[in-house]
């Protein structure tokens, strides 16, 4: 079967897996297909996940955004008025954003000889572009600063400094930008900065906490890139990987004012007991900041000669957009849909166990096959000795462990990172269902042992339940698709009402 999927660019013909579709009414489009309740299986869960991710890919959302600005007559987006257009940035979506931008500029009649750019991206996404250099800054599965990324960040800073008074800077920011744009403060080596980041990751620090520290040991984060730009206007285009889309947190806000301080960075390290573990150079740098001996990160947007801000930020896509597209596809596939929203956060295991309890409850209450969709991003606190995995694989394993304590049939979970990566692995996440439990029992695998060791990758690899979609060239946190086959009872909406009544 072929057709235009919800969330896919107009005219993009996509082959749709048909394992879960019933017969189609003649002469009907995808929005009018008539089908019996679909069979719930991994293929359906994966198709829903892909529909959500496709809607937040740059080749779809960036042209849509620019077209909207053109129709609204926003003078800032008349690209022909600028002598030079400088393009910089970093993130997992950087390559696709740069390619889509070049194509959009060409369509707008811009002479590309006036365009110059440098964007730090994962190695696997590099491709030749006409005027924007895509710099291979790190290999897949290495979500931490590298010497290659630091070199690229220095080039980006130099390019921003080269702007003339009437030039435009377009900054392309997406998830993963913090690790792809490392430029340590004077006196701090990249290895020392890596040591700090690894310690924070191990402790389960939130992205906001990590970035408060990163911004205060960096020459490019926390608004410092915008501070170095000397041109007319900076337009920052963002694909958000942070709950609530805070501009100062996404990729550590290289062009955004920073509300955090050296005191905040110090407090984060103190909270996790890391002050004695971090390198002396980092501790001394932060202490100098606390004493006011070195400048704070900028707290306001830089102003132009006309007194107006020289930087404007635009969020093109977020976790909410992916959830909406996934929900639309699920409904058109014949499912009832419940959205838990883009705000799930906290320690992975208790969040996953709660979702497993909800799945058991709803299965007894709903009467239609239902998709329960959730986003956000949980965290995993790791001991120094641990196995292999990522937060989505750990989520699926904790969910499965809880589900195994009752009847696991009729429930399928797909937990996946929308960037196609999950921790330092080649998987985006994993499936959790009754078949996984059967395979584990056959092989004598103890779920609790793997969960205790934080070794979810090894477990799911052994039972052929890893989810490996490859790099998606976007990143809007995580997307979980939970499919539930009804045992008996009422509608999904009524089940929610009843749950709130009993839980309250």
Q: Across the structure, where does each feature detected by a protein language model lie?
A:
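Glycine-rich oxoanion-binding loops at beta->alpha junctions
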Residues: 119-165, 208, 213-214
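A glycine- and small-aliphatic-rich helix-loop capping segment at beta-alpha/alpha-beta transitions
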Residues: 100-111, 131-134, 184-195, 229-231, ...
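Gly/Ser/Thr-rich active-site loops/lids in small-molecule metabolic enzymes
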Residues: 188-206, 258-273, 385-413, 501
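N-terminal glycine-/serine-/threonine-rich phosphate-binding loop
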Residues: 29-86, 95-108, 112, 143-165, ...
């Amino acid at each position: 079967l072929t057709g235009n999927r919800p969330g896919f660019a107009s005219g993009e013909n996509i082959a749709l897996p048909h394992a879960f579709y019933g017969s189609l009414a003649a002469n009907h489009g995808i929005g009018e297909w008539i089908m019996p309740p679909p069979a719930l299986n991994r293929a359906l869960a994966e198709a829903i996940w892909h529909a959500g991710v496709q809607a937040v890919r740059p080749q779809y959302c960036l042209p849509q955004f620019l077209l909207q600005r053109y129709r609204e007559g926003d003078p800032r987006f008349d690209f022909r008025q600028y002598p030079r257009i400088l393009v910089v940035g970093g993130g997992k979506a950087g390559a696709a954003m740069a390619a889509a931008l070049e194509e959009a500029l060409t369509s707008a009649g811009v002479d590309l000889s006036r365009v110059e750019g440098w964007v730090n991206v994962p190695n696997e996404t590099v491709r030749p572009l006409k005027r924007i250099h895509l710099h291979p800054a790190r290999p897949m599965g290495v979500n931490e600063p590298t010497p290659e990324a630091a070199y690229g960040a220095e080039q980006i800073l130099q390019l921003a400094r080269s702007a003339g008074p009437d030039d435009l800077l377009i900054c392309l920011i997406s998830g993963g930008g913090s690790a792809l744009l490392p430029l340590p403060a004077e006196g701090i080596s990249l290895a020392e900065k890596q040591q700090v980041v690894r310690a924070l990751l191990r402790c389960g620090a939130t992205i906001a906490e990590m970035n408060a520290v990163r911004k205060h040991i960096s020459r490019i984060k926390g608004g410092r890139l915008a501070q170095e730009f000397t041109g007319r206007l900076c337009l920052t285009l963002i694909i958000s990987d942070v709950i609530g889309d805070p501009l100062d947190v996404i990729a550590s806000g290289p062009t955004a004012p920073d509300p955090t301080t050296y005191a905040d960075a110090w407090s984060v390290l103190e909270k996790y007991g890391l002050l004695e573990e971090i390198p002396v150079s980092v501790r001394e740098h932060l202490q100098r900041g606390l004493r006011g001996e070195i400048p704070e990160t900028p707290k306001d947007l830089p102003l132009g000669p006309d007194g107006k801000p020289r930087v404007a930020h635009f969020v093109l896509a977020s976790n909410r957009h992916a959830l909406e597209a996934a929900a639309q596809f699920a409904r058109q596939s014949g499912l009832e849909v419940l959205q838990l929203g883009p705000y799930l956060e906290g320690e992975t295991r208790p969040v996953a166990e709660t979702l497993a309890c909800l799945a058991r409850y709803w299965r007894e209450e709903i009467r239609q096959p239902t998709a329960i969709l959730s986003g956000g991003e949980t965290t995993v606190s790791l001991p120094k000795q641990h196995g292999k995995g990522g937060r989505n694989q750990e989520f699926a394993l904790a969910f499965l462990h809880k589900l195994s304590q009752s009847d696991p049939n009729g429930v399928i979970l797909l937990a996946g990172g929308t960037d196609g990566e999950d921790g330092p692995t080649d998987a985006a996440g994993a499936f959790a269902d009754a078949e996984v439990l059967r395979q584990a029992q056959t092989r004598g695998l103890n779920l609790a042992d793997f969960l205790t060791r934080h070794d979810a990758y090894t477990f799911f690899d052994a039972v052929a339940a890893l989810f490996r979609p490859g790099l998606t060239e976007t990143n809007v946190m995580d997307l979980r698709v939970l499919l539930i086959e009804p045992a008996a009872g009422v509608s999904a909406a009524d089940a929610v009402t009843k749950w709130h009544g009993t839980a309250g």
